[in-house]
Amino acid sequence: FAGGIVSQRCLSCICKMESGCRNVGCKMDMGSLSCGYFQIKEAYWIDCGRPGSSWKSCAASSYCASLCVQNYMKRYAKWAGCPLRCEGFAREHNGGPRGCKKGSTIGYWNRLQKISGCHGVQ
């Protein structure tokens, strides 16, 4: 995974939560496609600075997709006032800008912590 403000362990847990940390291709989710290891939507990829050659090819690369997550968190997590630890990052990943403040992302965080090796992840 790419380095950045999100710890490697946290990235691994988000990856496991989204796809079992496999390139699972694209799936329709809430009216738009989510792709790859981190189930990245095209708008998220644009917000993370469009790394790689295209949205779908980046999402299909664990390194590029993790770089996108790192860039997204650098852009939004602090701005949104999220706690700069895994809970804030995971909820932001799930809920978009200001996702860490949305009640709808609490269940995502609780499910992520039940993944083997992810309880109490920072």
From Swiss-Prot:
Assembly and binders: Monomer.
Other comment: Unlike Ruditapes philippinarum lysozyme, catalytic activity is not affected by variation in salt concentrations.
Protein's UniProt name: Lysozyme
Residues given in the record as substrate binding sites: 41-47, 72, 93-95, 102
Lineage of origin: Eukaryota, Metazoa, Spiralia, Lophotrochozoa, Mollusca
Catalysed transformations (reactions): Hydrolysis of (1->4)-beta-linkages between N-acetylmuramic acid and N-acetyl-D-glucosamine residues in a peptidoglycan and between N-acetyl-D-glucosamine residues in chitodextrins
Family designation: Belongs to the glycosyl hydrolase 22 family. Type-I lysozyme subfamily.
GO biological process, one term: defense response to bacterium
Keywords for the protein's UniProt record, in alphabetical order: Antibiotic, Antimicrobial, Bacteriolytic enzyme, Disulfide bond, Glycosidase, Hydrolase, Secreted
Coiled coil: none
Annotated localization: Secreted
Single GO MF annotation: chitinase activity
